[in-house]
A protein has these predicted regions:
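Non-catalytic beta-strand/loop surface segments
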Residues: 1-21, 57-112, 136-175
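M16/insulysin-pitrilysin zinc metalloprotease superfamily fold
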Residues: 13-47
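Helix N-cap motif at beta-to-alpha junctions
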Residues: 17-20, 119-124
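Short amphipathic alpha-helices in soluble, non-transmembrane regions
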Residues: 26-31, 127-134
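Bacterial peptidoglycan biogenesis and beta-lactam-recognition machinery
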Residues: 39, 122-124, 134-140
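Active-site neighborhoods of enzyme catalytic cores
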Residues: 54
Length: 175
């Protein structure tokens, strides 16, 4: 499973804690995501379809429509105000494979990745396997200085309303 937010993409694998072989396979998957993704034309086009379908699905859901309306209100005057994590569908539909590869090379770097393991597992086994498998991820040739984006604190009184025929109740929130 995975998700993308404004500042990160997180991949999650749920595996049994007591099976070393499965642990190794899971770490190999993480390794491949980190440095060995293949960008075959057909796969890039397929992934575009997945993103477009996720976007369509969000547009058809009440929570998705609400998020599209409310998030820009909360993120007013920030870089995120008009940039949903899923991206601009015109860009997604028309992006070239080369631009996708450039993005991957820029942002998928070991120095800005973390592996977090949670569960009842031997830390010595886990640490050894992480070092053995993920230790082979090559260091970046070009270092990346991570940008920082702030969301200004809104000190004015403001309101946001969201009306949708699917809403069965009236909800009032104060933030």
């Amino acid at each position: 499973n995975a998700y993308t937010s404004f500042e990160e993409t997180v991949y999650m694998l749920e595996i049994p804690a007591d099976n070393k072989e499965i642990l190794q396979k899971a770490l190999l998957i993480l390794h491949d995501w980190a440095c060995a993704v293949s960008f075959e034309d057909e796969e890039v086009e397929k992934e575009k379809g997945v993103i477009l379908e996720e976007w369509r699905s969000r547009q058809q859901s009440l929570s998705g429509r609400q998020m599209e309306k409310v998030l820009p209100f909360f993120l007013k005057d920030s870089r995120f105000e008009h940039r949903m994590p899923i991206g601009d569908m015109d860009v997604i539909q028309n992006i070239s494979k080369e631009r996708v590869v450039d993005f991957y090379k820029k942002w998928y770097k070991p120095e800005i990745m973390s592996v977090i393991a949670i569960g009842d597992i031997s830390t010595s086994v886990l640490e050894t396997e992480i070092k053995n498998i993920l230790g082979t991820v090559p260091a970046s040739e070009e270092k990346l200085e991570l940008p920082t984006y702030s969301v200004p604190f809104n000190q004015t009184k403001d309101t946001c309303s969201f009306v949708d025929p699917e809403f069965q109740n009236t909800i009032l929130n104060v933030y």
